[in-house]
Regions:
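Short helix-initiation/N-cap motifs at beta->coil->alpha
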Residues: 78-90, 133-134, 169-184, 219
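Ligand-binding clefts/hinges and TM-proximal coupling segments of bilobed small-molecule sensing domains
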Residues: 22-23, 153-170, 209-210, 240-265
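Extracytoplasmic small-molecule ligand-binding "clamshell" domains
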Residues: 23-101
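Bilobed "Venus flytrap"/periplasmic-binding protein-like clamshell domains
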Residues: 35, 43, 56-72, 103-104, ...
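Extended ligand-binding regions for polar small-molecule ligands
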Residues: 63-72, 132, 152, 222-259
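Acidic, polar ligand-binding/catalytic clefts
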Residues: 78-140
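A ligand-binding cleft/hinge motif common to bilobed small-molecule-binding domains
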Residues: 87-90, 103-111, 159-160, 183-184, ...
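Periplasmic-binding protein-like
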Residues: 40, 120-128, 194, 198, ...
Length: 265
C-alpha cells in the first residue's frame, strides 16, 4: 500500500513538474505569431522602406524592442503590419497584437485603447528652421510660427501651455509634412517628441537649425492594443523584464538620445 502511494505521489509530482515547464500560451491574434503595428517615417525608431503594408530591411529602437519582446514571450514568428498613426485610436478591433509608434500614454487615449507598461520616457522637442536664432526659453516660443502633427501631445502643449501669438500650423497625415514645413521655412519650430526630432535632425543635419531644446512634460510611450486586450499582462511582464535587465536602456543609447538637448524653461 505504501509502495503504491509513493509511486502515485511520484507520478503526480512528475506531471506537475512537466506542466510547469511548458510555456504558457500567449493570447495573440494568431497562435504562435506576433503581429506588430508600425508606421513610417520614424527615424531611429523604425528605419527601413515601407512596401505595401509591411517594411523591408527594418531596424531602429522600436523594431529592436519588438524583437526583444517576442523573445521574452517565447514567440519566434513576428509579422509587421503598417498601421497609420491617425487610426491608432479608433475603437474598432485592430489587426495587430500591439503597435509601437512613439505613442504617449494619456487618460483620454486610454478610454478607447489599452496601453502596455511604459517603455520610454519622452519630453517634447523643439526642432527649428535653418537660420533661426535658437530660442532659449518657453516664453521665446510664443513669438514664433509653431507647427505640430495632429492628434499629438505636442499640439496639445502648444494650444494649452505655450499659447503662441500666431495660430499653429497643423499637419494631419504624418510627421513628414511637419518636417517639410520646417525645412521649407514655413514653420519656425516644430513641437514633437524629442527623440523623433533629434533623430530627424541627425538624419538631415543641413536641412534644419537643429534641436533648440526640450520641454519637460513627463510623458511616457506605451504599446497600443485593443481595449481590454488579454495580451496586456504578458506584454507588461515582458517590457518590465526588459527594463529591469538593462535591455531597453542599451537600445535607447544605441538608437536614440545622444547628445541630450538642453531643457527649456
Amino acid at each position: 500500500m505504501k509502495r503504491l502511494l509513493v509511486t502515485a505521489c511520484a507520478a503526480a509530482l512528475a506531471v506537475t513538474a512537466a506542466a510547469s515547464a511548458q510555456p504558457l500560451t500567449v493570447p495573440t491574434k494568431k497562435a504562435g505569431k506576433l503581429i506588430v503595428g508600425f508606421d513610417v517615417p520614424a527615424p531611429s525608431f523604425w528605419n527601413g522602406r515601407a512596401t505595401g503594408t509591411t517594411i523591408k530591411n527594418p531596424s531602429g529602437f522600436e523594431y529592436a524592442l519588438s524583437q526583444a519582446i517576442a523573445m521574452k514571450l517565447g514567440i519566434s514568428k513576428v509579422q509587421y503590419l503598417r498601421a497609420p498613426f491617425s487610426g491608432l485610436f479608433s475603437p474598432a478591433s485592430k489587426k495587430y497584437d500591439f503597435a509601437l509608434e512613439e505613442v504617449t500614454i494619456t487618460a483620454q487615449r486610454a478610454k478607447v485603447v489599452s496601453f502596455s507598461a511604459p517603455y520610454f520616457d519622452a519630453n517634447q522637442g523643439v526642432l527649428i528652421r535653418k537660420g533661426l536664432a535658437k530660442p532659449t526659453s518657453i516664453a521665446a516660443l510664443k513669438k514664433l510660427q509653431l507647427c505640430a502633427q495632429s492628434s499629438t501631445t505636442g499640439l496639445a502643449y502648444i494650444q494649452h501651455k505655450i499659447r503662441p501669438a500666431k495660430k499653429p500650423l497643423v499637419y494631419s497625415s504624418s510627421s513628414t509634412a511637419a518636417f517639410d514645413a520646417v525645412e521649407a521655412g514655413k514653420c519656425d519650430a516644430l513641437i514633437l517628441d524629442v527623440p523623433i526630432v533629434a533623430a530627424q535632425s541627425k538624419k538631415k543635419p543641413g536641412a534644419y537649425g537643429g534641436v533648440a531644446g526640450q520641454i519637460v512634460t513627463h510623458e511616457q510611450y506605451g504599446a497600443v492594443m485593443d481595449k481590454g486586450s488579454k495580451l496586456k499582462p504578458s506584454l507588461d511582464k515582458a517590457i518590465n523584464a526588459l527594463k529591469a535587465n538593462g535591455t531597453i536602456k542599451r537600445l535607447v543609447k544605441k538608437w536614440l538620445l545622444n547628445p541630450i538637448p538642453p531643457i527649456l524653461k
